[in-house]
A protein has these predicted regions:
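N-terminal, charged/glycine-rich beta-strand/loop interface patches
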Residues: 2-99
Length: 99
């Protein structure tokens, strides 16, 4: 079984089946995903509260991928095992009216 790594350099903001797969895997392969934080780096450790007023909500919750699983067909249920999650050392949270 192979291991693949997808970096966070090509995020996309929503599920889109027209995007070409970044990697094609066989069932049982391992994929390591690097992800951006929820604002796609609009909020950084140096940000103050004022950054919330200028967030581009079209970039919120960036995704890494897509991954094509060989042999999978539309309607199939795929089992995914999350082996570990590692954070990048900081995080943020906000209550945003209307969001």
């Amino acid at each position: 079984m192979a291991t693949y790594k997808l970096d966070d350099k090509q995020p996309h903001p929503f599920w889109d089946n027209t995007l070409a797969p970044r990697v094609r895997v066989q069932p049982g392969d391992t994929v390591i995903f690097e992800t951006l934080e929820a604002s796609a780096n609009q909020v950084t450790p140096a940000s103050g509260h004022e950054v919330m007023a200028s967030l581009d909500f079209g970039l919120i919750h960036p995704l890494t991928g897509p991954v094509y699983v060989e042999g999978a067909e539309p309607g199939d249920a795929l089992e995914v095992e999350i082996i570990s999650i590692k954070h990048k050392g900081w995080g943020w949270n906000a209550v945003i009216p209307g969001f």
